[in-house]
Amino acid sequence: MSLALLFCVLLSFLSFSCSSTSIPKNGSVIIPEDFFGVVHAGHTKSVEEYGLLDELGVEWILTTFYWSNIEGQKGVFDFSEYDDYVDTARKNNKKVIAVLAYTVDWIFPEGKRKRYISPENIPYFLNFIGETVRHYRGRIDAFSIWNEPNFVFWDGSDKDFFELSRLTAQRIRETDPDAYILGGAFWRSPGGFIKRMYKAGAMENIDALAFHPYAVNPEGSMKVYDKFLRVLSEINYHAPVWITEVGYPTGGWYPTRVSREKLPSHVIKTITGAAARGASTLLWYALTDTYNEGEVPNTNDSELFFGLAYPDFSRKNGAWAYELCARYLPGSRYAPEFPQKENMPSNIVSFCFMDGISGVNTLIIWNDRNRSQKVNLRLSSPALLHDISSGQNRSLPGEASLDIGKEPLFITWEGTDVPLLFIQ
């Protein structure tokens, strides 16, 4: 079964479309200043690509450091491909997450390569880990162990993966005690898998857990996030949570597909929900589509359509929504006590982020129902209403009547004024 088909089948059973937004119950949180990142970025090493990354407010970039690309021949290590990648990222002030993963032909002398490392071959993988971590000590900002082992990227038993993960984290820590280690990289929130991994001791040396809350829409994605937090609470495990992949393709046949027109709304809602739940980092999957518009050879393949932009670095409109969030949310405090409300129905969803590093406050509002609703906003400070699809903005009066629909409104203002939402 192809990856695309398997992805669709699994999501058809596991995902669900939620009609209402779940509001986080964790209280006030501070959004990290380096919250924002993207996957599959930095490979062209071009001025144009890094220019777009800067415009978007990207702090982190992630790529896979394939074992086969580094030690294609047993005992012969070639880091040249990744040296250039890392050096360019550091020169451009981007932090790098290196995913250490997958296999080499020479451990499968009698058969086709699989995404599995048997116990007798683990020492070879650990040697690759040690050499790579030693080579990049002080130059890589985080190491992530494998990718989605509970999905299609691990062909062995859970038990064998837990041992591989445990020993890999141990080897990284021994090689570089200061390394930041991400474990898990789970696809969605596999409760039983996580609990067994914890019981096997595979989380002992890691600094944070990574996961990928893919779902058919942002509401479903946040349900996945809430389940993930419940699982961690059940095992009494406390560590930062990193979202190292989340996104929605604008083409193909994945059930997560969204139109380009609705992508900005999905971007805003997903980022807002994750930030308010206390995620340490969020990396959007991905920076660019595989092909420029009109050049796609297979329009059924959703994997080709996940970008915020195109390979020529022209933007989809979802990129403007990402940039808005990256400009105003870092350093702010998610303030669940705001905005103040009078006679507000529960279908009007609002998230307030106060005192960002730019000295600006942000109010994001949308309606869970399909029809729009008139709501009044009162602020004594001047405010701006931003278009999430274009980056343009317009001024709002001190008291404004707003049409609240399914597409979020993104409002910013300076000062200490507290917003009031009310219906007359």
Q: Language model features by range: what are they?
A:
Residues 4-15:
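Bacterial N-terminal signal peptides
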Residues 73-74, 108-234, 252-269, 298-301, ...:
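Active-site cleft segment of glycoside hydrolase catalytic domains centered on the general acid/base Glu
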Residues 21-131, 137, 144:
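N-terminal substrate-binding region of glycoside hydrolase catalytic domains
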Residues 254-327, 337-345:
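Aromatic/acidic polysaccharide-binding cleft in carbohydrate-active enzymes
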Residues 341-382, 388-391:
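Carbohydrate-binding surface patches
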Residues 396-424:
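C-terminal beta-strand-rich structural cap/linker in extracellular carbohydrate-active enzymes
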Residues 34-40, 61-63, 96-100, 141-145, ...:
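Hydrophobic faces of well-ordered beta-strands that scaffold small-molecule active sites
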